[in-house]
Structure formats: C-alpha cells, structure tokens
Amino acid sequence: MTEEVHKLKITIFTDKGRSTISGGDFPLPVLPYPAPYTFRLFDYEIEGPNLTNKEFKVKTGKIEYKGEEFDIPSSSKGSWRGVDEEMDLIYVTIYPSRQPKKVFHY
C-alpha cells in the first residue's frame, strides 16, 4: 500500500531574515509538547538564507500542511540538516519555546 505524499512548508524569521523550506514529507510521529517537531523532507526547496547545518532562533514562524497553518512560537529554536544528498533528503527540527496556539499534527 502506497502512502499519500503531502507537501509541507515551514517559514521562519530569524535575525538573518526570512527562510522557507518546503518539500514532500515522510510522516514521523509527533509527540506532545514539549517534544520537538521533527520533519523529514525530500525533494526540498529553500528560499532565503540557507540555514542548513546551523542552529537558529525563531522570531516568528509557521508550518503549512494540508491547507492548515500552525504557528511556531517566538523564541523557539531549531535546525535543519542535510542527511542524504543523493536522495535529496533533509531533517528539520523545531523546539517550541512554549505550547503553540494550534499544535501541529498529521
């Protein structure tokens, strides 16, 4: 059975400006807060400053998935890191600073 692939888009504002990363998402379990959000994206695109293999602090941000928006609280931290260039695969991790107004779910 083939699982349906959905596009996931994450937009964050840091002291370096606006960065967006988007791509097809392999669903991973999302644990209740305070656990971090971890996304594994393939065939991804980056707009704005490339934050790959760097940690960042979020001023504001949001996650867009299946037509819904989920906020990323200010002062959250995160990183994205390249895993496999051959497969065009990257992991994005967001550590929410507090309970978001609308918690992300698949």
From Swiss-Prot:
Highest rank taxon of the organism: Eukaryota
Gene Ontology process terms (BP): cell adhesion
Biological source species: Dictyostelium discoideum
Family label: Belongs to the csb family.
One Pfam family in the UniProt entry: Dicty_CAD
Protein name: Uncharacterized protein csb family protein DDB_G0271326
Matching InterPro entries: Dicty_CAD
